[in-house]
């Protein structure tokens, strides 16, 4: 919780879920070496995009490069009809075949190496979105797992108060309040494909009702079940 300054256990997080409606975003990541070609990426947390270091696809799923009115797009074959009314399939591959394919970073404020390419992991589903997700290892368990598997750099452009850092143009602004500013920046760069409203369940602090953020930090947790018998005996 950025307000309380404390990490929460999974049990505490489970106590504060609320249904919220906020903007998700489909982002156009330019594919390196391919003119007017983009990876179409979906996220419900635009504030994490400045900390992006990779993209991720499901290695077992089918992906297509489609020709649309305004360019070429890579996305999951099963989701193409949901996002485009009219298109032609130019190429079809497995997710595994996209592994290692490079793209141009949206924001390169961190100046990192060994970054900005496609990774693979089975956690990517085709339930929503485009079948391609962005990876920011500092903000999520799955992202961190992929980051370790590919030895990706650790970029955390949000401080422990939940504010955007000085490396971004939005220093001091609470990360979730920065969402519309990130969308505005994407639109100016011509990389905003769409920003539909998305209703989903989001965790809030059970103490203060503040929206929680998934944030990598050093923490200590006590395994109370391991000392349960001793606690009962002492009381």
Residue ranges of model-derived segments:
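Residue patterns forming the tRNA-binding/recognition surfaces of aminoacyl-tRNA synthetases
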Residues: 1-50, 100-102, 111, 123, ...
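Protease-associated
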Residues: 54, 61-132, 141-144
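Short linear motifs in intrinsically disordered/low-complexity regions
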Residues: 59, 70-71, 160, 224
């Amino acid at each position: 919780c950025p307000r309380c300054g404390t990490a929460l256990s999974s049990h505490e997080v489970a106590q504060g879920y609320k249904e919220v409606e906020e903007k998700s975003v489909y982002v156009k990541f330019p594919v390196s070496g391919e003119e007017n070609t983009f990876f179409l990426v979906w996220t419900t947390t635009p504030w994490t995009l400045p900390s992006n270091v990779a993209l991720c696809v499901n290695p077992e799923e089918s992906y297509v490069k489609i020709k649309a009115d305004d360019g070429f797009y890579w996305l999951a074959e099963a989701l193409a009809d949901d996002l485009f009314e009219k298109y032609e399939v130019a190429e079809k591959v497995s997710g595994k075949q996209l592994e290692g394919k490079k793209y141009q970073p949206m924001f390169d404020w961190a100046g990192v190496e060994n970054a900005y390419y496609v990774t693979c992991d089975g956690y990517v589903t085709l339930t929503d979105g485009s079948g391609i997700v962005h990876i920011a290892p500092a903000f999520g368990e799955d992202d961190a797992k992929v980051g370790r598997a590919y030895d990706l750099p650790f970029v955390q452009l949000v401080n422990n108060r939940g504010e955007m850092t000085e490396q971004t143009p939005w220093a001091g602004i609470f990360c979730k309040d920065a969402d519309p500013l990130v969308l505005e920046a994407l639109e100016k760069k011509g990389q905003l494909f769409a920003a539909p409203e998305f209703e989903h369940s989001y965790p809030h602090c059970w103490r203060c009702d503040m929206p929680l953020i998934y944030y990598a930090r050093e923490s200590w947790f006590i395994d109370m079940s391991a000392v349960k018998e001793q606690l009962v005996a002492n009381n």
